[in-house]
Amino acid sequence: MRNATSWSLYRRLLSYVRPYWKAFLAAVVGYAIYAASSTALAEMMKRLIDGIQNPDAAFRLMLPLFVIGMFAARGVGTFLGTYYMSDVARNVVHALRCEVFNHMLRLPGRFFDMHSSGHLLSRVTYHVEQVTGAATNAITIILREGLFVIGLVSYLLWTNWMLTLIFMAVTPLIGLVVNYTSKRFRRLSRRIQNSMGDVTHVASEALSGYRVVRTHGAEAYEKARFAEASDYNREQSMKVALTKAVSTPVIQLLVALSLAGLVWLAMSPALMASMTPGEFVAFITAASLMAKPVRQLTEVNSTIQKGLSASQELFGLLEQPPEVDEGSYVPARIDGRVRFEGVRFRYGEDQAEVLKGIDLDVPQGEMIAIVGRSGSGKSTLVSLMPRFYRPTEGRVLLDDVDIQEYALSPLRQRIALVSQQVTLFNTTIAANIAYGHPDADREAVESAARSAYAHEFIERLPNGYDTVVGDNGVMLSGGQRQRLAIARAIFKDAPLLVLDEATSALDTESERYIQQALERVCRGRTTFVIAHRLSTIERADRILVMEQGEIIESGTHGELLAQDGAYAALHQLQFQEAE
């Protein structure tokens, strides 16, 4: 979409208007009434001047009625145009915003790895609002003032076509100015939108990590980062303001020069003889009335280009390919047998392999613990099962069926994930436990909480299960948040459970509660546990030791200690640290 033309962007935006064509047509009719009634002001001046020279009783009666009718029609047209165009615009923006958000939910994990959340949020909020400006204010002005200009030009041609063509001689010059400023507005608008993403990103990081900022005394550093991002946005906005401030007076000057030449020519004896005083005044009035709509049409150009630039970014996002979901297999039930066959994986073609020929067979109901240094590929390995990523080579099988053959949603519904970075939503505890099931039975929610050893602390909260936990569970302790995450996994009742460093950042008491909860939730389920504390996985059926993307050791806790290899060294190191 980077090289998309203005017309192609307009055409795509208009496709969102199609479902609301009736309201759009009503708005066009309203603005046509407005333009016709406003143009009638020139005709009123003609009748007034000519009527003064030849007054009669009918003229005295008809002219006031003409004035009343003209302004009444103008009011009706303004109402119809403004209301129905706002209705169309807000519906278009709503549809576009929802489409962008819904598409984001379907994008693959690699996309989110390559884009900051601040820039993505900016597209849903700031970019869409720029389209709103183009879809409401800009289109309103284009239709209303554009039809007004068409009406005035038509009236001028009807009154004196020769003078009108002379008056229109400056149109090519105005077109050159508009063309230059349009390109500049689009370029600057793209920079402003990117800088707004930077502003959102810096603010989001600093505010969500305010504890780290304060404990490290980094307030001054974050202030400087934010000021730099905001100042760049200000600089680009001022360039837009400068372009707008120069272009509008230039266009007005061109119109004024044309109008001055028109008056000079119109006052020549030859033309004065061919026109009545009323026609002369009406012609000059119509030409003068054109200054305001032309000015508004040139000023709205910056808003249009901002909207086009924003829509270009949004359409580019919508063209990102969604997560691949070519599978169609939907099993009635899953036992939980997992097999990795020659699995290799790299995050990018120019990056080193993270997994190197993984072969692993896990029977139903077995608990597999995975240990190793940071960066050894543990989390990447378990991320392949819910298809957050696809293997570069090899395949992963669930119940002897390649997971690529499964329909994506049913596959993920049968996998429960609990990680160190718990995600809680700013809603009630009950809604967090039953996430994705708004009509869940309260007894089932409480049963899951009891199994996760969370019921006791929940009951002590002021509103119990109806307590709102705050942004990402800020009102709860780390252990409480972790127990809610486990309760969510228990409520899901999936046959396959993945625990990614679920207890690594907890105190001893919280870890004891969570260990008891995990022992309960793991029963009868195939479980993958990534652990930093080896004491938490001693009861695992099998322990895998990973190093640089390979499984270098496999066995029970006792077997691996007896081998006196990498696992024994890790165990000895942690034992010494504990002492």
From Swiss-Prot:
A GO MF label: ATPase-coupled lipid transmembrane transporter activity
Annotated compartments: Cell inner membrane
Main subcellular location: membrane
Top-level lineage group: Bacteria
GO cellular component: plasma membrane
Gene3D superfamilies in the record: ABC transporter type 1, transmembrane domain, P-loop containing nucleotide triphosphate hydrolases
Enzyme class: translocase
Membrane spanning stretches: 24-44, 61-81, 147-167, 253-273
Family designation: Belongs to the ABC transporter superfamily. Lipid exporter (TC 3.A.1.106) family.
Protein's name according to its UniProt entry: ATP-dependent lipid A-core flippase
Species of provenance: Chromohalobacter salexigens (strain ATCC BAA-138 / DSM 3043 / CIP 106854 / NCIMB 13768 / 1H11)
